[in-house]
From Swiss-Prot:
InterPro entries given in the database record: BetA, FAD/NAD-bd_sf, GMC_OxRdtase, GMC_OxRdtase_N, GMC_OxRtase_C
Annotated family: Belongs to the GMC oxidoreductase family.
Active site residues per record: H477
Pfam families per record: GMC_oxred_C (PF05199), GMC_oxred_N (PF00732)
Protein's UniProt name: Oxygen-dependent choline dehydrogenase
Enzyme type, top EC level: oxidoreductase
Lineage: Bacteria, Pseudomonadati, Pseudomonadota, Gammaproteobacteria, Pseudomonadales
Entry keyword annotation includes Lipoprotein: no
Pathway this chain belongs to: Amine and polyamine biosynthesis; betaine biosynthesis via choline pathway; betaine aldehyde from choline (cytochrome c reductase route): step 1/1
Length: 568
């Protein structure tokens, strides 16, 4: 527990970005940092967060998960949908699926075309991805070998379904790639994961804080719920927070800056509660307006996905591992040897494709899983099976986050506005139909049984749309709600500094202007690494000179090995 009342920097949120900043800022001698986290420690003996294969467990309770819900989503049968966010040291890196996916080079080149974001091109960002990473098979032009984030690659001898699913994607006419984070993201191939060589989850608490905690210049307070940021005029001077169930406000001062790293839900929420945001929202709640900034909480984006599930005709799926009587042996091997089923998140193959020539870079992502079950561990199919998670990457739909009261313990109002555009519906129809073509390729002949979900009778546009409305779920990638840029809806500049304010930055997935093509943990860490150098007054790392794939006029798909006709 801290006793000081003043620090150089106060960081709100010990998630993927906050832990990165805390570690990097305290590398400079004499720089004091207070890291505030509303959740608790990352208990290293709790298999639910430390065992990769147990990734569904933290989503089922509230110890590690804020477990937000959306408002009724108007295009999704008015379902209130899950919006799980990490709570505890590590933030969402403590409960995520551990997929290490950086996004497409064109995502960052697209950001860099926006005024004020010119230094966010892919070749500007790549050195920071490398700085953060230690890849188990060693560094190269795309991968790091000395960073805090431990990345494990799939190995020979893993589940045969991974290999079969990648081969099926290639047989369907799509590219093959040997590294989804390397020269070419587009195509099917092995998927890296944030797991240590000893088979433990490589959260940012493990990667960054374990080293930083040794410095007496870093103070960490857990169970510290931020009430609001304190201002003198337009200058951030400190933070007021509550500890545990107490209503006693503790105030601490920042000599240099307040760094908000709460993520795409909490960061706009804290800004609004502090009086920075759309005046119309704040006035309704009698929150004094410090700065009318209309973009705070707007532009909210996410990835939506569906599961296409198939029975498996050979007993090679992970179905037996779901049975309680098999789990002690799996747990013991993982605990004592760091190997076996427990040591993998089981997302060891995936892919990125263009569903039509209209897209310059991939717009559909696949995760393959050698068992048929919901992401949060519910509704496991009671037989051998496998599934593909399929989702669109850059939906035009935009949502918002608004506070509902001044009370820091009250959850905000969240609306993603999923599937609000015609493009969304076309992408999901195409995604299901292309997946069915992939699943019918010869590589899966030895394994493929009947289609469990959606079911072979779901064929028409109307039937597919209804399936999406009823069954699509979040991929847990909220972002973009405090976007970088210079237009009237931008919240921060290209260094994370809040427009119109002093000594206040937002550094997390909320500042993405447009969501990236893939999972968000790796990009969030990169963003924090890059802005850490700005805060420290350091020269940016030299631009990379690595080559990268641009599709140009290359076709999205070649001729499939086996032609499949769609039923109407």
């Amino acid at each position: 527990m801290t006793t000081q009342s003043e620090y150089d920097y106060i960081i709100i949120g010990a998630g993927s970005a906050g832990n990165t900043l805390a570690a990097r800022l305290t590398e400079d001698a004499g720089v004091t940092v207070l890291l505030l986290e509303a959740g608790g420690p990352d208990y290293r003996l709790d298999f639910r967060t430390q065992m990769p294969a147990a990734l569904a467990f933290p989503l089922q309770g509230r110890r590690y998960n804020w477990a937000y819900e959306t408002e009724p989503e108007p295009h999704m049968d008015n379902r209130r949908m899950e919006c799980g966010r990490g709570k505890g040291l590590g933030g969402s890196s403590l409960i995520n699926g551990m997929c290490y996916i950086r996004g497409n080079a064109m995502d960052y080149d697209g950001w860099a075309k926006e005024p004020g974001l010119e230094d966010w091109s892919y070749l500007d960002c790549l050195p920071y991805f490398r700085k953060a990473e230690t890849r188990d098979i060693g560094p190269n032009d795309y991968h790091g070998g000395e960073g805090p984030v431990s990345v494990t690659t799939p190995k020979a001898g893993n589940n045969p379904l991974f290999h079969a699913m990648v081969e099926a994607g290639v047989q369907a006419g799509f590219p093959r790639t040997d590294d989804l984070n390397g020269y070419q993201q587009e195509g099917f191939g092995p998927m890296d994961r944030t797991v240590t060589p000893k088979g433990r989850r490589a959260s940012t608490a493990r990667g960054y804080l374990d080293e930083a905690k040794k410095r007496d210049t870093l103070s960490i307070v857990t169970h510290a719920l931020t009430d609001r940021i304190l201002f003198e005029g337009k200058r951030a001077v400190g933070v007021a927070y509550l500890v545990g169930d107490s209503d006693t406000r503790i105030e601490v001062r920042a000599r240099k800056e307040v760094l908000l790293c709460g993520g795409a839900i909490a960061s706009p929420q804290i800004l609004q509660r502090s009086g920075v945001g759309p005046a119309e929202v704040l006035n309704k709640l009698d929150i004094p307006v410090v700065h009318d900034l209309p973009g705070v909480g707007q532009n909210l984006q996410d990835h939506l996905e569906m599961y296409l599930q198939y029975a498996c005709t050979q007993p090679v799926s992970l179905y037996p591992s779901l049975k309680w009587w098999n789990q002690p042996a799996i747990g013991a091997e993982w605990m004592f040897l760091g190997t076996g089923i427990g040591a993998s998140n089981q997302f060891e193959a995936g892919g990125f494709i263009r569903s039509s020539e209209a897209f310059e870079w991939p717009n559909i992502q696949y995760h393959f899983l050698p068992v048929a079950i919901n992401y949060n561990g519910t509704k496991g199919v009671q037989e051998h099976g496998f599934q593909a998670h399929v989702g669109s990457m850059r939906s035009p739909s935009r949502g918002r986050v608004h506070v509902k009261s001044k009370d820091p313990r009250e959850y905000p109002s969240i609306l993603f506005n999923y599937m609000a555009s015609d493009q969304d519906w076309q992408e999901f129809r195409d995604g299901i139909r292309l997946t069915r073509e992939i699943m019918q390729q010869p590589a899966l002949d030895p394994y493929r049984g009947r289609e469990i979900s959606p079911g072979i009778d779901v064929q028409s546009d109307e039937a597919l749309d209804q399936f999406v409305r009823e069954h699509a779920e979040t991929a847990y990638h909220p972002s973009c709600s405090c976007k970088m840029g210079t237009d009237e809806m931008a919240v921060v500049d290209g260094q994370g500094r809040v427009h119109g304010m002093q000594n206040l930055r937002v550094v997390d997935a909320s500042i993405m202007p447009i969501i990236t093509t893939g999972n968000l943990n790796a990009p969030t860490i990169m963003i924090a690494e890059k802005i850490a150098d700005k805060i420290r007054g350091r020269q940016p790392l030299p631009r990379s000179t690595a080559d990268y794939f641009v599709a140009g006029d290359k076709p999205a798909r070649g001729k499939p090995l086996r032609e499949i006709s769609h039923q109407a």
